[in-house]
Curated annotation (Swiss-Prot):
Top EC class, one word: hydrolase
InterPro entries in alphabetical order: MetalPrtase_cat_dom_sf_prd, YbeY, YbeY_CS
Name listed for the protein in its UniProt record: Endoribonuclease YbeY
Binding-site residues, Zn(2+): 119, 123, 129
């Protein structure tokens, strides 16, 4: 495991070196996504505690998913609510699943990572996608945020499936 990297108040822990090898400037991409989502109406982590980000393997995500959701399989992103007012929560991403989804959707790994960081940050801020109105609002913020970062609309490109993302 590499030491945490601090950007904009966010602890970024890269458990799997393939993240850095596949997404040059990984930490900067994450920081940019968090700043961009605030500009589009999402959570502003300069005003509240920022989340910790763990870039992990599917094996780690599978273990967490089994322990906290009783689902013995990996997923793309898990979010964990803050345990105290001084903590911003946690966003955990599984490398193999995220890479596979990006390839299937014909998107860069950087674009998909940015999308899932934004998605996780919105979950931590209380947004959800279980009802059509909530989903439209959340997807709208995600789309505006990703466009501001120079990426296309994640809901119109490729085969993106939100079903794998979960909030705990």
């Amino acid at each position: 495991m590499e030491p945490p990297s601090r950007h904009a108040g966010t602890d970024i822990i890269i458990e799997d070196a393939r993240w850095r090898a596949s997404v040059p400037g990984t930490e900067r991409a994450i920081r940019r996504a968090l700043v961009a989502v605030a500009r589009q109406g999402g959570p502003d982590f300069t005003q509240s505690p920022a989340p910790s980000i763990l870039l992990a393997t599917d094996r780690i995500v599978k273990r967490l998913n089994a322990r906290f959701r009783d689902k013995n399989k990996p997923t793309n992103v898990l979010t964990f609510e803050p345990l105290s007012p001084m903590h911003g929560g946690d966003i955990v991403l599984g490398y193999e699943t995220v890479r596979r989804e990006a390839a299937a959707a014909r998107r860069s790994l950087r674009a998909h990572l940015s999308h899932l960081v934004v998605h996780g940050a919105l979950h931590l801020a209380g947004y959800d996608h279980h009802h059509p109105g909530e989903a439209r609002e959340m997807e709208g913020i995600e789309t505006r945020t990703l466009r501001s970062l120079g990426f296309g609309d994640p809901w119109r490109q490729g085969n993106w499936q939100q079903a794998g993302s979960v909030r705990i």
